[in-house]
From Swiss-Prot:
Keywords: ATP-binding, Glutamine amidotransferase, Ligase, Magnesium, Metal-binding, Nucleotide-binding, Pyrimidine biosynthesis. This is CTP synthase. One of its GO terms (biological process) is 'de novo' CTP biosynthetic process. ATP binds at residues 14-19, 71, 238-240. Residues 1-265 are annotated as: Amidoligase domain.
Length: 543
């Protein structure tokens, strides 16, 4: 039977509930337990798929094609369990399902209310997502006291009561601010946050106190006294220079043992040796490289969270410190490619819309002509293709129909039909809804032997996650290949181009998929590892 740990946050948002929860999950997994994680998001959007990356951060895509909160990326980077569409749902998704059932008549004429109908649907989804694991860690988005969070908090209160104290724990994350003027930390915000939580019927079993420095024992005891939490269950979580230090920090304070004792689980001591190797590599680099990420959402780094992390993971594998320079593609348009001259490699990530596209195309051209290592992801592949078509294949004004519907050379166009991972034919048109209509999730890709990308993966068949609605136009593919661009990966039905590369370039690879979603600190990812290695080589030879 599954045991539940419900995670809530108080005082302020952005305290790192997802990181703290994932770190606890990593320790429990290191003890031999099977662990999964769920994120409950209080916003009314059905999913984050159509939300602005500048507001919400990146959209993380799972193997089964769910467009989810970026916290699921943290979960997959900390534990081996792969997330699915069951691991993240929103208020909008819950209401959509309840209203659908009401229209069908499933409720037999009852008046539909938040309690019990909405809360029952939340509980059903939590139980379904947790099924089959020793422990499920359930994170509730937002902050205690938010109006939007109330149905979720009520649902987890009910579920905790229904499964019993032997199978449910509540973990609350709060801020303990430091006041420089008095030289003191202040516990009052934490006391009030717990008071708010208790007013709705939830007594936390573990308090994780975020602070600038380690909390003195006297302050931990004071918090324990006023919140009715055991002294040993008040965990101090100070700021650290690497999030991968947090599992060891929590284990040192016995957090995993609190969970094991509460649930009566028999398991081994946690083996964190893999995390120790990660920290050693992070602390002992042999050199550093400068990689430019040419994007359009650079004002919010979380918009490219998984790409940032994947580059860091590749740095660990190469024992290199990766300095990531987020460069607005519109700056490349206005200031020219001279702003790229000090870079050791260039990465163009995914994105949508015409704004800044010419800057990305210029960056791809700069990388090609100056033999700078280049990695294109999704849109990054499309701009590389457009650039090559224009400047090498002689297709003047070549473009994507997304940006110029009247282009004389539509080298990239809307995918109108494709086979999904289950073998089902999907059809789209220009008038299809934006939400949930892209080619999504893990897809099989066949790599061409003898290519650089085949060398990187060491395999002819790979699975990578996708999120796009535009693809290479096969009607112009032969003409571009004849000019020297190599198609090095194709979809299962051979109809969609998945990877391209330039054979006479030291390292120029671009893929329609998103390899960043499967990179982890312990394993890295072959494409990113190869890319950062190429950056290191370029740096030695040119800088």
């Amino acid at each position: 039977m599954t045991n539940y740990i419900f995670v809530t946050g108080g005082v302020v948002s952005s305290l790192g509930k997802g990181i703290a929860a994932a770190s606890l999950a990593a320790i429990l997994e290191a003890r031999g337990l099977t662990v999964t994680m769920l994120k409950l998001d209080p916003y009314i959007n059905v999913d984050p798929g159509t939300m602005s990356p500048i507001q919400h951060g990146e959209v993380f895509v799972t193997d089964d094609g769910a467009e989810t909160d970026l916290d699921l990326g943290h979960y997959e980077r900390f534990i081996r369990t792969r997330m699915t569409k069951r691991n993240n749902f929103t208020t909008g998704r819950v209401y959509e399902e309840v209203l659908k059932r009401e229209r069908r008549g499933d409720y037999l004429g009852a008046t539909i209310q938040v309690i019990p109908h909405i809360t029952n649907e939340i509980k059903r989804r939590v139980i379904e997502g947790a099924e089959g694991h020793d422990v499920a860690i359930v994170e509730v988005g937002g902050t205690v006291g938010d109006i939007e969070s109330q149905p979720f908090l009520e649902a987890i209160r009910q579920l905790g009561t229904e499964v019993g104290r032997e199978r449910a724990m509540f973990m609350h994350l709060t801020l303990v601010p430091y006041m420089p003027a008095s030289g003191e930390v202040k516990t009052k915000p934490t006391q009030h946050s717990v008071k708010e939580l208790r007013s709705i019927g939830i007594q936390p079993d573990i308090l994780v106190c975020r602070s600038v420095g380690a909390l003195p024992a006297s302050e931990r005891s004071k918090i324990a006294l006023f919140t009715n939490v055991a002294d040993k269950a008040v965990i101090s979580l100070k700021d650290v220079d690497s999030i991968y230090r947090i599992p060891a920090a929590l284990k040192a304070q016995g957090m995993d043992q609190l969970v094991v004792d509460r649930f009566g689980l028999e398991c081994n001591e946690a083996d964190l040796s893999e995390w120790e190797q990660v920290l050693y590599a992070e602390s002992n680099p042999t050199a550093e490289v400068n990689i430019g990420m040419i994007g359009k959402y650079v004002e919010l780094p979380d918009a490219y969270k998984s790409v940032n992390e994947a580059l860091k993971h590749a740095g660990l594998k190469n024992r290199l410190t990766v300095n990531i320079h987020h460069i607005d593609s519109q700056d490349v348009e206005s200031k020219g490619t001279q702003i790229l001259e000090q870079l050791d490699a260039i990465l163009v990530p995914g994105g949508f819309g015409e704004r800044g596209i010419e800057g990305k195309i210029a960056a791809a051209r700069y990388a090609r002509e100056n033999k700078v290592p280049y990695l294109g992801i999704c849109l990054g592949m499309q701009v590389a293709l457009i650039e090559y078509a224009r400047n090498v294949a002689g297709m003047e004004k070549a473009n994507s129909t997304e940006f110029d519907p009247e282009t004389p050379y539509p080298v990239v166009g809307l995918i109108t039909e494709w086979l999904d991972a289950a073998g089902t034919t999907e059809v789209r048109t220009e008038t299809s809804d934006l939400g949930g209509t892209m080619r999504l999730g893990s897809q099989l890709c066949h790599l061409i032997e003898g290519t650089k990308v085949h060398e990187m993966y060491g395999n002819a068949e790979i699975y990578e996650r996708h999120r796009h609605r535009y693809e290479v136009n096969n009607n112009l593919r032969d003409q571009i290949e004849a000019a020297g661009l190599k198609v090095s990966g194709l979809s299962t039905d051979k109809r969609l181009v998945e990877v391209v590369e330039i054979p006479d370039h030291p390292w120029f690879i671009a893929g329609q998929f998103h390899p960043e979603f499967t990179s982890t600190p312990r394993d890295g990812h072959p494409l990113f590892t190869g890319f950062v290695a190429a950056a290191g080589k370029y740096q030695k030879e040119n800088h």
